[in-house]
Amino acid sequence: MKITWLGTAAIRLEADGETVLFDPFVQLVGGENPNCLDDFLQDQTICVTHGHLDHLMEVPEFLDPESDAEATVYCGEVAAETLSDMVENTSNVVKVRPGDVIRLGDVRILVMEGKHAKPGKSQVFQKLFSRKFLQYFRNALALAYLNPKFPEGGQTLMYEVHAEGKRVQVMGSLGLQEDQEYPQGADLLILPFQGSEFLEAVALEVVERLQPKRILLDHFDDAFPPVSEHVDTRRFKKLMDEEYPQIK
């Protein structure tokens, strides 16, 4: 099994002869991990966790009949509705909901209910009145225009991949439903480390509930300035070593 982080929440998982791409996104001007659409277009199976632009905006390119991509896209109903407003042919868009199982050869992907993180008001104000906001003002205008077109709509999914005798949990945002029971002990949890004013505390709550064997952090990079920012992960690593030394 091979897992590659491609910036933001984009993850490519290769196992049992299958390749699955989660949440592809091309970073904006000034992004910390510059990439391009060609980095993704060879992928044939796309899983989307939710409808926000940094998870869904590039997906129409995979559905363009004039491109070389002929991908199948799995996503929730809200994200599917967004795609239907953007492309003429959505025959390759498969709506999924919690409890569904996606089967790709010997790979099995369980769809689970997630929850989107809630940024604090102080975080928003800090970004609006920062020098960075002026530096990337064109990005800010583009994001202000695009953001309403990509609603999350209260629907964030989480995926658990079963392949090669391993379980990998892929979260698209740092949140779990309070009344939901989740499988524990995954071989790897891909944890988006962004989006909360109390980031370490919220992440530790997720770890406590899921009890993974290993963790891979993503989404902590500055992908769409001035709205995003680079998040220092060292404090979280220190807390993990203290509270969960068995988790690597």
Task: Indicate where each model-derived feature is located.
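Catalytic phosphate/metal-binding cores of nucleic-acid and nucleotide-processing enzymes, i.e., regions
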Residues: 3, 49, 53, 74-75, ...
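Active-site-proximal loop/helix segments of hydrolase catalytic cores
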Residues: 144-208
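Active-site neighborhood of phospho(di)ester-bond hydrolases with catalytic His/Asp-centered motifs
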Residues: 21-25, 43-52, 74-77, 169-173, ...
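Pre-active-site segment of Zn-dependent metallo-hydrolases
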Residues: 12-53, 57-65, 69-71, 118-147, ...
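Metallo-beta-lactamase
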Residues: 77-157, 163-164, 238-245
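Binuclear metal-ion centers of metallo-dependent hydrolases, dominated by the metallo-beta-lactamase
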Residues: 70-73, 84-101, 183, 204, ...
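Beta-strand-turn-beta hairpins that frame and shape the catalytic cleft
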Residues: 1, 14-20, 101-110, 162-168
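Active-site environment of divalent metal-dependent phosphoester hydrolases
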Residues: 29, 52-57, 80-83, 100-102, ...
